[in-house]
């Protein structure tokens, strides 16, 4: 073999090795999700709350058994979100429609979730229905630094009386050394009609924007996730106008927000909840510019989705084709929730 031929073979080997090495970049991946768990109430009548109006209180037979099954069903869903990709439970999950901390304790103790070392962040809110937002996190992946609950002060347009609703929960912490801020929301409902209730959600949006702006004032590249049941679509003024959430990543500037859920609704026709056979995407995960880009030395946004596996969809009856709700006509259906969860993946290159 000639010297020049040997050099050529060596060159080809190292060239191919280089290409193979680049194509084999490896990434860490985590799921961050939000789930409206539809009236996750305990079986005890709390005199300080209007929980007697909850579907759980309408159950007159085997209420304890219904509660245990409801917990098991919710835990199954949470465990499944993103599992086909990450092969593990979500790192962070925002929750809405939980009555108190105890129901969340019962939730994370279920066998579907007990293998993950989840901790809870929860504040009691002044909501008249007695429902709160909360967050669970895998403490092996996420380490909270600070938490705060922001009270939303809104008033009825006609009576000027205060409307007691859910707080907005801010959790700041590190996802494997990367500082991340998570806001969990459940904005005022469309009770009384969209037009009459719109001002309440726009007030919620202004509070949310204030929180986001305060984080951006400390760091223009802050990694922020605001997620929840906003009771508005991505195109509504509360999200599009007040929060300024953009549909396209390339349009997002410093200190602005990107809403990956908008394309899911408008381009793919996928929603998270349905009313009178019309799909809405009220359950959204919205992120800041700081989580965008191709520098994966820190955690960045990879993909978003609505978790709508077939078992979560009603197969028959009045609500056929809609999310398989837990309660209907004061009875437990052995379903899950009237909302699908929404989620994102965050990825970081392994060194």
Indicate where each model-derived feature is located:
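Bacterial Sec-dependent N-terminal signal peptides
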Residues: 1-27
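Extracytoplasmic, non-cytosolic globular domains
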Residues: 122, 169, 173-264
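Structural recognition of the beta-strand scaffold that forms the well-ordered cores
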Residues: 31-34, 91-96, 119-122, 134-137, ...
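Structured beta-strand-rich core segments of catalytic domains in phosphoester-bond hydrolases
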Residues: 98-179, 185-187
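Metal-dependent phosphoester-hydrolase catalytic domains
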Residues: 22, 214-224, 232-351
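N-terminal, active-site-proximal structural segment of metallo-dependent hydrolase catalytic domains
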Residues: 19-113, 117, 121-133, 309-321, ...
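Extracytoplasmic/secreted cell-surface and envelope-processing proteins
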Residues: 42, 102-105, 129-132, 191-194, ...
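Second-shell loop/turn segments in exported
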Residues: 56-67, 89-95, 122-123, 157-159, ...
